[in-house]
Regions:
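Active-site beta-loop-alpha junctions enriched in small/polar residues
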Residues: 78-80, 130-132, 158-162, 183-185, ...
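Canonical Radical SAM [4Fe-4S] cluster-binding loop centered on the CxxxCxxC motif
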Residues: 69-109
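Short, charged low-complexity linear segments at domain edges
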Residues: 53-74
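Conserved Radical SAM active-site core
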Residues: 98-238, 243-245
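Hydrophobic faces of well-ordered beta-strands that scaffold small-molecule active sites
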Residues: 73-77, 125, 155-159, 178-180, ...
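Auxiliary Fe-S-binding modules of radical SAM enzymes
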Residues: 1-50, 248-377
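Conserved, mostly hydrophobic/aromatic
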Residues: 34, 61, 89, 180, ...
Length: 377
């Protein structure tokens, strides 16, 4: 059974780096005028040569976004269920080597958090945990997903990679989507930053979206942690390769791409490569040209100023007022957080800023009486 690992083995990191850096202004202009991007076109739009074409790139990305999604921008919020973790990763506040207070929400905690989240108007929920299979694994998810499903119109997860059969079971319990970020597609760099635990297994993580596709999960989210490797352009191109593979092999699923940049955290590290805000805009817009139909997401890792200016260009999914620690909405304890969000505005403030620019915030885009895509056979 083929997976993206087979395609990944055909890709040479250094060759891709040289090809991206070798792209010319003519290559960029050809890509901007292409009706459908090739892999070479994507390299051109991620290249240094494309920096001089940012306005044209943004204009085309905005046109495609409006054509496909109108003026709508969906809102979601993360609910952190646990900061327990059995991995030791250099960049994460939840890393097992960090001496922080640990907490896992029980049924009563989840009810309080859910009430606080619903009071703010959110209907799209992203469930987040550290990676601790023994204490926050399938038994925990089986206990709590059904109650959460009754309260929210969309349930997605960002937890440890699971087996195909486990994803199929969670789908029946009401799970709609899974976000799984490879962190970096450079194997040696990956090994340097994942020191202990199951997350050391590069290929188990790399093949997770294949397992999601085979299990029929409705939405699959991809991304690289920008700044973890020494070349964000190559990592971003690898995300594009991963997306194209999945779209070809699991066309029934929908896809989402996120663009997380390293943020300060307990025991964190300095970025190995810096993507500035113009380069982040360049990357976001390149993905919109590559795949006009997918969801592009921007989290509260970015500043209010930046989000207010970039969301209208190509973003159609945003978080707001994110708390990155268990119990953060009902009882805020910052010492438990995974990383420090940059945009800490209330959701109504974010919505007002977008409405002022002619965009339509969407808090809910599905009703339970219509049935759930996650449960269709």
């Amino acid at each position: 059974m083929k997976t993206f690992s087979d395609r990944w083995r055909q890709l040479d990191w250094d060759d891709i780096r040289l090809r991206i850096n070798g792209k010319t202004a003519a290559d960029v202009e050809r890509a901007l005028n292409a009706s459908q991007l090739t892999r070479d076109d994507m390299m051109a739009l991620l290249s240094p040569a494309a920096s001089g074409y940012l306005e044209q790139l943004a204009q085309r990305a905005q046109r495609l976004t409006r054509q496909r999604f109108g003026n709508t921008v969906s809102f979601y919020v993360p609910l952190y269920l646990s900061n327990l973790c059995a991995n030791d990763c250099t960049y994460c506040g939840f890393s097992m080597s960090n001496r922080i207070k640990r907490k896992t929400l029980d049924e009563a905690d989840i009810a309080r958090e859910s009430a606080a989240i619903r009071e703010m108007g959110f209907e799209h929920l992203l469930l987040v945990t550290g990676e601790h299979q023994a204490k926050v694994g399938m038994d925990y998810f089986r206990r709590h997903l059904p109650a959460l499903r009754e309260q929210f119109s969309s349930l997605q997860m960002e937890v440890q990679p699971l087996a195909e059969t486990e994803y199929a079971e969670l789908k029946q319990l009401g799970l709609d989507g899974v976000m799984v970020y490879q962190e970096t597609y450079h194997e040696a760099t990956y090994a340097r930053h994942h020191l202990k635990g199951k997350k050391q297994d590069f290929f188990w993580r790399l093949e997770t979206p294949d397992r999601l596709g085979r299990a029929g999960i409705d939405k699959i989210g991809l991304g690289a942690l920008i700044g973890l490797s020494d070349n964000w352009r190559v990592d971003s191109y690898m995300v594009a390769e991963h997306l194209l593979w999945l779209q070809q092999h699991y066309w029934q699923s929908r896809y989402s791409v996120s663009f997380p940049r390293l943020r300060p955290s307990t025991g964190g590290i300095e970025p190995a490569s810096i993507m500035d805000e113009r380069q982040l805009v360049q990357t976001i817009c390149a993905f919109r040209l590559l795949a006009p139909e997918i969801e592009l997401s921007l989290s509260t890792r970015e500043s209010p100023w930046f989000r207010d200016r970039v969301i209208p260009l190509a973003i159609n999914n945003v978080s707001a007022f994110s708390k990155t620690q268990p119990g953060g909405y009902a009882d805020n304890h910052p010492e438990l957080e995974q990383f420090s969000p940059h945009d800490d505005r209330r959701p109504e403030a974010v919505a007002a800023a977008l409405t002022a620019q002619g965009l339509q915030p969407v808090w809910k885009d599905w009703d339970s009486y219509l049935g759930r895509a996650s449960q269709r056979l």
